[in-house]
């Protein structure tokens, strides 16, 4: 069962039953439930699905491209591809996907779901031009095609899909931004999982975990709010051990700079000016800080505001 997300589910259903090709981007911060939403909303209706490999713990750019291509090829094999060798380029890989989809085509809606798409776009891999060609040269001419892409690296989705000025300009037919649970949705979640929580404890859980479904999914029946928090964040083997470092490494191109900014902002309730951030972190005021702040804002980690007076 999906808690909340009624508008997002209705949007996906509407797009599924449209009579034209659809290119949908679903984005939002990591752990917010994007993959779960898509798989539950379109259960048993996905023709092909693949998830990019996390860049965390990967080495050189060349090695990362090889790993991504390898993983994509195995997904093709697992879902019915026959008679093709492992692709050496993304252009070849998407050609193989086209062949598989043609083989599986019954005339009904075909849903292609590519999760964590930004991870697949490794440096100098030629991924984006090949992906553009896949949509522009093949998918867009098939009325039964529904391509759904998903990613936690919101800045990548916005820069390369929503605001693309090249081959994918204006190609998205829908965008779905998935936000954390509201306070009411947190309450619904605890009711659904039969975890007894007072109104005050639900409010505290929201303040600590920010309405992120993945985090509150670790709450256990029979434990108090304090016991659950201790088990998730502090105990001898906390569930979210090293989450901070792994989260930033998976989302941002410059995780160390992003962490510096977040740590600094956490020290003052009223926030900092760009100049103050630059002076305190050593990140140059030019493109470096601008890009870092833009990525953090777009990923809902920080917010920009203009003080009055």
Range-by-range predicted roles:
Residues 1-309:
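Phosphate-binding site recognition
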């Amino acid at each position: 069962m999906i808690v909340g997300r009624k508008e997002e589910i209705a949007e996906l259903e509407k797009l599924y039953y449209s009579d034209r090709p659809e290119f949908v981007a679903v984005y939002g911060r990591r752990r917010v439930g994007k993959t779960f939403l898509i798989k539950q909303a379109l259960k048993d209706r996905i023709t092909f699905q693949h998830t990019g490999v996390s860049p965390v713990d990967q080495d050189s750019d060349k090695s990362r491209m090889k790993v991504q291509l390898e993983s994509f090829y195995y997904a093709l094999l697992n879902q019915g591809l026959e008679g093709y060798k492992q692709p050496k380029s993304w252009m070849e890989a998407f050609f193989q996907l086209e062949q598989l989809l043609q083989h599986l085509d019954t005339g009904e809606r075909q849903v292609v779901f590519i999760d964590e798409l930004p991870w697949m776009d490794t440096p100098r891999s030629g991924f984006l031009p090949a992906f553009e060609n896949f949509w522009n040269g093949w998918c867009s001419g098939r009325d039964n095609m529904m391509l759904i892409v998903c990613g936690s690296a919101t800045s990548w989705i916005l820069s390369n899909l929503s605001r693309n000025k090249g081959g994918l300009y204006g190609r998205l037919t829908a965008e779905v931004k998935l936000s954390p649970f509201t306070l009411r949705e947190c309450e619904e979640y605890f009711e659904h999982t039969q975890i007894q929580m007072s109104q005050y404890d639900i409010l505290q859980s929201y303040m600590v975990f920010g309405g992120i479904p993945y985090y509150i999914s670790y709450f256990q029946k029979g434990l108090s709010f304090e016991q659950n928090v201790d088990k998730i964040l502090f105990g001898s083997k906390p569930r979210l051990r090293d989450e901070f470092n792994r989260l930033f490494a998976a989302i941002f191109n410059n995780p160390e700079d992003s962490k510096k900014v977040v740590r600094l902002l956490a020290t003052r309730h009223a926030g900092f000016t760009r100049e103050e951030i630059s002076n305190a972190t050593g990140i140059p005021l030019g493109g470096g800080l601008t890009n870092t702040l833009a990525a953090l804002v777009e990923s809902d980690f920080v917010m920009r505001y203009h003080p009055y007076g």
